[in-house]
Amino acid sequence: MSELLLELFSEEIPAFMQKNAEKGYLNVFTKIFEENKIFAKVKVFVGPRRITLHATHLPKVTLPKDTAIKGPSLNASEAAINGFCKAHNVSKLELFTKLINNQLYYFFIKKTEEREIKEILPEIIIEAINKYSWTKSMFWGDYNIKWVRPLRNILCIFDGEILPMQFGHLTANNITYGHRLTDNKKIEVENFEDYKNKLSENHVILERTKREEIIKAGLLELANSHDLTIKEDNRLIEEVSGLTEFPVVLLGRIPLKFLELPKEVLISSMRRHQKYFCLFDKAGNFAPYFLFVSNGRFVNAELVIKGNEKVLAARLADALYFYKQDIAKTLESNLSKLLAVTFHVKLGNLREKVDRITNICNYIAPNNKDLIMAAKLCKSDLVSEMVGEFPDLQGIMGYYYAKHDGLDEEVATAIKDHYKPQGLSDNVPNGNAALLATADKIDSLVGLMIAGEAPTGSGDPYALRRQALGIIRIIIENKLELNLNDLINFSINLYKDSSDKNKDLIISFLKERIKFYFKNNYDISLINAVLDLSAEDLVSVSLKLNTLQKFLAEDAGKQLLNAYKRASNIIGDQKITGLVDGNLFTTQSEKELFAVMQKILPQIIDSITDKDYERVLNLLSSLLAPITSFFGNVLVNDPDPKIVQNRLSLLQNTCELFHKIAKFNRL
């Protein structure tokens, strides 16, 4: 069995693309090998400047392969059939037919003789390199090849020998390179073991997972040695492992004067911008230290530490300056600046948006002074110096500035949390923050839909799907008593150019997002049954789904559903009009069914008002016996058309009782 070693050596590959490339190239090479009847054990390694493939257990030769080649249909013209035969150098006698989608087609078997693996590997490798699709890629120079970053070298060795291969301007060789900063020299290798060892000797750790383990261990060791703690941050560890070929963890100091900054500013400056790790004391307070990952072990580590301390100090000095500039003003004084910030070219400026949000909040919770104050100031930090420099701190800085202005904690928290949730994994806000978040998201959703920014299959630039899901989650998880239709109507009326068409579009869009929210926990037919009755009260929708799912899973629920379906099937699409007339009953079963209906109707209405859907289903269950008796003893058809109509009305009214909780005809 043979071994293949391939290294694509390039300029720096973006860290966030590396893990996907590792998985992607593994899948691509594995699939292409299998398609060519080459069964090998494949591994892929990725780092800042290289993607490496190691394949073992390759055969020396390929297996003979028979491939069925599809031709024209049996009804095709003689010229088309002859053309197919000529193109593939076969006679018509060699063709056979095969049925595909009720249509017969001509086929022939193309036989591929066994070939030496090394003869076909170059074309397979080039196909695989091109087949993986990077998130972003580029051309460079005059070369007609496209990759994530300019390729500088290709190493390709098969069974200890260079595999003759040309990719664009590059010819395969047996050369790799060591660490960019400390050992950037040509290194000749013979096989994978030699390759891996020589890279290690020249300060390159090939395996991504091993680099991550080294970083984790280094972080913990330094944190523990200073009696400090570090919060788990696997995403940042993964990112810095993609920036370093030989990671070494070092510790730097933060001047104490910068600790007066809000902790989120420190974290944003360090984590997001510098890729540094924050440290905390045992009480959870921010410590005046940070950890960072150096790309290599240098003789003068102190010089490296001083350099990183200097870079961080400069960034924090800017942040401290911005912070002091901002707290010299009040949030309220920033309101006039919002006039100069466009929300959307068709929807006006941010000050107008703030006014709409405030109106919606006043509609949702009249006389809630804290909520109205939070609504009025919720966007004021967007024009602050700090948020201008650190956009990810929107809302958070509003919280600190509100506290500095002497506003209540409830107001400050609402300003901070009103952007939540920012994804499925994010918690929803509560209290006034939940109401403010709902108002903000409703205004954005309604306004942007009116402006023609509805999501399409190819994009959702304003994240309206996420906004809608946020509204749904906030209402359900906070059990907010809000009528979604009324809320949309109110919001639409705050815009001058709106119409019923806009309302229908928005409600339809929200309904689809409601289905998306529930689809993982409930059958779509049950979701449709509940939503087709009403999607206005999301708390009720959630309670109904939960109650109905449990009920219909039981034997009693299944029996009641079957009884409903018997009644519903008899009515079908008929338009039944007229009241039930007790004087037209001719059987005891009719009388009993009608009596039970009249008895439970007011109780069902009261239970629905109280959202006691379990009681509603228990009341409906009392119809099972009389419905069963009706179908056992009564024929709907009768010589007297009045009696027929009355019986149909009785069944219609029976079904309508079920429809007070859900459209059972959708189940």
Curated annotation (Swiss-Prot):
The UniProt entry, under HAMAP family, shows:
Gly_tRNA_synth_beta
Q: Which organism is it from?
A: Rickettsia canadensis (strain McKiel)
Spell out the Pfam families in the cross-references. DALR_1, tRNA_synt_2f
Query: What is the top-level taxon of the source organism?
Result: Bacteria
Its name, as the record gives it, is Glycine--tRNA ligase beta subunit
Subcellular localization is given as: Cytoplasm
Listed A to Z, the keywords are:
Aminoacyl-tRNA synthetase, ATP-binding, Cytoplasm, Ligase, Nucleotide-binding, Protein biosynthesis
InterPro entries this protein is in?
DALR_anticod-bd (IPR008909), Gly-tRNA-synth_bsu (IPR015944), Gly-tRNA-synth_heterodimer (IPR006194)
Keyword Aminoacyl-tRNA synthetase belongs to the record: yes
